[in-house]
């Protein structure tokens, strides 16, 4: 019996994770990647003997990764508990390998401590490591007036984590009713106010308000606008830690590619999709607004047509609907709706290698360097869309953990500066190089990397133009739609297209949102939707496989 076929557009974390899951569901899956190597935003750059992860660098919830590597052909395990009791109770690994036995066959994952060192503009810092007593000690030193507030924040963030992540994290909000059912809980938890406002309930010191609200910037969210449900990030990291893949995030990408191919999947590079092909139910051109619309495959930029029973976009939601599907096939995701959606911020990212001999580098693996303004800078980036005279940055130095990414006596680093997306109208060819020079001068002159400009060996940078041109992100956004309340849950793009049958979304633009754990959750949610829609036999969807072609009993259709 011929297996159903699937095409996934894009080989980011979402596309690779879903590819593995579709192979485990019994599909024959092809991933089409526009670039010359896998990863999408997680592309890896090799330059002058240095290796740089161009995108995600923070790994949390390692059991999500273990779950993928443990899958096998025709055994999707979608019916197993999403958060087994043992996984939650075991907590985080603090030393050695933090990947499970299946993961460790493909990639070595290790814990990082502290999670982040957060530098304030006055030179003081806070080591954020998830240890409650260490956190109390640092608050005592920096803001003793906020000790009692931390205890209340800790308890309330845990309640949000337990309800919002453990219980509701995998909820697919496909209709208004599914969202209305959870609103009372969110109101009770005070999780619909903004995250920054939530932090200010507990902390009076501006430094503590920043420490306990900044993390949504790592998933494209403005702390002044995202709902307080994101306070659960504190407890997600506290529960499972922050981790790193030896060899860089690219090593994890390669592990996913290897697993996908071992399960029989195919990945093609330099394969840009120009159009998602749509017909009516009879395979003809749809006529009129009431005609059915079914995804039948894709057409590549070179004209090649590929047929499939399922088409999934791991690309940007806005770009998918505006560029790949003709407007006449879209009613819900119309041009007007897509263009009115708020996109996340963009980034200027500087990748640089430098000589380390004789350098006493007092930095950590992950460093957050906050500028003199917090709320005002966020408003400049997200609302005014101007390039401010000041900036904050995330400085990543993986060679402190993994020297293999650079030649001996050298470091490979990148620093990421949040900036407005291309709705700003800024000419990045002009302002980009000037910002890069300011950022590198700051790191040098403020003593973070003394003598940096003389020590530089290689450098490369990207601006919002890279995200728009190379990654096909609408307006050059870096994280998909902005995760404000009005674009969350039901109001976030749906994993199953409302316009075209057999078309699905996965990744940062879909539910539940951006960030590596959310993207892997998105893959599982989309796999469940596909399993339901195609009546996948329960023995495949929920556990051990059956022989291809074995007839399914109606009562055994997946009910996850």
Walk through the language-model features, giving the residues of each.
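Mid-domain catalytic core of redox enzymes
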Residues: 274-285, 290-406, 547
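C-terminal segments that line or cap access tunnels to active or ligand-binding sites in enzymes
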Residues: 355-464
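Rossmann-like flavin
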Residues: 121-226
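Helical element adjacent to the flavin cofactor pocket in flavoenzyme catalytic cores
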Residues: 232-283, 295
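Active-site-proximal substrate-binding core of FAD-dependent oxidoreductases
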Residues: 278, 532-560
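A glycine-rich dinucleotide-binding beta-alpha-beta segment and adjacent secondary-structure elements
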Residues: 205-219, 390-396, 449-512
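N-terminal glycine-rich phosphate/pyrophosphate-binding loop and immediately adjacent elements
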Residues: 2-162
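A conserved FAD-binding loop/helix module that cradles the flavin
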Residues: 510-530
